[in-house]
């Protein structure tokens, strides 16, 4: 199963159904694929298409892209290419195994993106079949930020390794090289590929203060209205400009009141003026950016922004993430985009007066646009609303499904106990409670009538504790109690199983998750949805075959 294909199938079906019901009525579709977010998955035949395509490495690929962009007229002929950041290794410095592994991770990325683009092409072909393609406005945005460097210098078999505090070894990665791009892994390429993908700009996703974190290509097609086909436009634009562009094209205004509620004014500026006026000055003169304490401001051709305070792969990492540099102590850069499209020449030291002007503008606009106060999540969560962080007791009954991690018991770095009141026997199987999935989590279930607790700390770090004997038929309270060795994220500890208060099994959990259990799956009662925490069962056969009265979780 691939989501991108399924989404395209549904989009095409919806469009055809709508046209069958009302062929003269226009339609609006917002189509947002999950790619190129991790995991980078694709069918095997698509993975095979890209074997050997990136053996030249990231330095050469970035240069090749830069030369091609110049030749095509996408960037100015006098553009300069910024150097590789010191935190990233040169391709030529890598070992043979590193090159083989890293190239394969990039092949999986390319295959996943190409497969997703193919599905978008199917959707456009379906519009063409209706005869309305020339009269259809299509806005194709390349991405929502810069390419992701969150795979770190060495890439990842599991993106969760970073957020759970797990270190992947080179030997482990090489042992799984043939699984890259498939369902067993949650793979992400090394950060240097992200740097190459962001050519000609420096930096990457998260760094909203720099061009590599915010600039993306965009294609607008509307053959009936746009006569300058294949031409480039360089006016400064922001994603908030898309909605006003669509509204102007349709000929309607954004409502000022919806169901009696006054609406905030639309920030965007229609890009319709660029359709026929290639040389028109940019209607958007100013834009503010902020993400994870990366501050940026654009004004009339000038771009000022902070330099990253930490690497992208450190931002979501488990462990101590306290900042040592405050918002007022950040180092800033300054670029004149009119003469330096690729932001290769930092003018911050040469023009401190202009930099100060831009910094003052940032703080003024931040106050106007509800960006203040700026509080990085690494500075702590005290005072933030949470449905689960401040609770120590949780009670669930059958039917509770996919409860978000923040609302579920916060077990990271803590001792905890699970008690399940059930009616079961020697033939009962299935999940009583599960949180997370294949790439991190825990599950308490019955297998052949025996209580089992499985803790999935990602990859090879899986731990199972099982009772020796099956249950007698009847009502029971089944318990799993984890005694942490210490109150710290990632702590090992001892897991003990109980049946009606009597210990029936015990074992060590060599490590626990240090960050999030799962950033994609929640807590389930009575079955395990989306993906299975334990290899002992599948999602399809995870349903509890006995009866559950309630499940209680207590945090100690």
Residue ranges and their predicted role:
Residues 1-2, 54-56, 105-111, 204-207, ...:
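Active-site rim elements
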Residues 4-83, 112, 116, 121, ...:
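Active-site regions of oxyanion-processing enzymes, predominantly non-cytosolic
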Residues 25, 30, 38-47, 80-81, ...:
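Short, solvent-exposed loop/turn and secondary-structure capping segments
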Residues 27-32, 137-141, 200-202, 218-221, ...:
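Structural recognition of the beta-strand scaffold that forms the well-ordered cores
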Residues 40-42, 47-94, 148-216, 304-321, ...:
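Core domains of carbohydrate- and sulfate-ester-processing enzymes
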Residues 52, 124-125, 160-281, 451, ...:
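Substrate-binding rim/cap in mid-to-C-terminal beta-strand-loop elements of soluble/periplasmic
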Residues 196-216, 289-350, 354:
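C-terminal, low-complexity/hydrophilic appendages and adjacent surface loops
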Residues 373-556:
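Extracellular glycan-associated modules
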């Amino acid at each position: 199963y691939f989501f991108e294909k399924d989404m395209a199938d549904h989009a095409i079906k919806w469009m055809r159904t709508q046209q069958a019901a009302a062929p003269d009525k226009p339609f609006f579709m917002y189509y947002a694929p999950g790619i190129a977010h991790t995991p980078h998955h694709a069918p095997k035949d698509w993975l095979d298409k890209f074997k050997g395509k990136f053996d030249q490495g990231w330095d050469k690929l970035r240069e090749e892209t830069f030369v091609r962009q110049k030749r095509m007229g996408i960037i100015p002929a006098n553009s300069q290419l910024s150097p590789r950041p010191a935190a990233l290794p040169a391709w030529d410095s890598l070992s043979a195994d590193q090159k083989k592994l890293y190239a394969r991770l990039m092949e999986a990325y390319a295959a996943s993106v190409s497969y997703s683009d193919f599905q978008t092409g199917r959707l456009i072909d379906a519009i063409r079949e209706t005869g309305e393609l020339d009269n259809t406005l299509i806005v194709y945005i390349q991405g929502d930020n810069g390419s992701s460097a969150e795979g770190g210098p060495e890439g990842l078999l599991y993106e969760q390794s970073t957020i759970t505090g797990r270190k992947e070894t080179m030997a482990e990665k090489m042992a799984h090289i043939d699984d890259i791009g498939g369902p067993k892994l949650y793979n992400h390429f090394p950060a240097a590929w992200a740097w190459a993908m962001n050519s000609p700009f420096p930096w990457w996703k998260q760094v909203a203060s720099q061009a590599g974190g915010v600039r993306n290509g965009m294609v607008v097609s509307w053959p009936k209205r746009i006569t300058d086909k294949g031409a480039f436009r360089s006016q400064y634009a922001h994603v908030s400009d898309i909605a006003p562009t669509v509204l102007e094209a349709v000929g309607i205004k954004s409502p000022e009141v919806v169901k009696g509620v006054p609406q905030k004014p639309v920030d965007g500026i229609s890009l319709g003026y660029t359709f026929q006026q290639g040389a028109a000055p940019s209607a958007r003169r100013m834009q503010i950016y902020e993400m994870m304490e990366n501050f940026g401001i654009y004004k009339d051709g000038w771009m000022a922004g902070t330099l990253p305070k930490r690497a992208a792969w450190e931002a979501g990492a488990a462990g101590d993430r306290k900042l040592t540099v405050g918002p007022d102590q950040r180092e800033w850069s300054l670029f004149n985009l009119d003469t330096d499209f690729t932001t290769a020449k930092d003018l911050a030291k040469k023009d401190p007066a202009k930099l100060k002007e831009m910094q003052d503008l940032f703080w003024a606009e931040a106050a106007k646009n509800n960006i203040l106060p700026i509080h990085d999540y690494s500075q702590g969560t005290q005072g933030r609303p949470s449905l689960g962080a401040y609770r120590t007791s949780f009670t669930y009954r059958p039917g509770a499904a996919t409860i978000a991690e923040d609302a579920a018991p916060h077990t990271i770095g803590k001792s905890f106990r699970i008690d399940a009141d059930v009616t079961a026997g020697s033939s009962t199987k299935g999940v009583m409670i599960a949180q997370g999935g294949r790439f991190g989590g825990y599950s308490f279930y019955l297998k052949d009538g025996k209580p089992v607790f499985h803790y999935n700390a990602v990859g090879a770090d899986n731990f199972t504790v099982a009772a020796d004997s099956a249950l007698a038929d009847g009502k029971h309270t089944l318990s799993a109690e984890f005694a942490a060795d210490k109150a710290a994220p990632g702590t090992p500890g001892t897991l003990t199983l109980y049946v009606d208060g009597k210990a029936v099994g015990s074992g060590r959990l060599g490590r626990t998750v240090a960050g999030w259990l799962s950033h994609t799956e929640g807590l389930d009662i009575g079955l395990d949805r989306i993906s299975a925490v334990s290899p002992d069962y599948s999602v399809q056969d995870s349903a509890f075959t006995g009866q559950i009265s309630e499940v209680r979780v207590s945090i100690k």
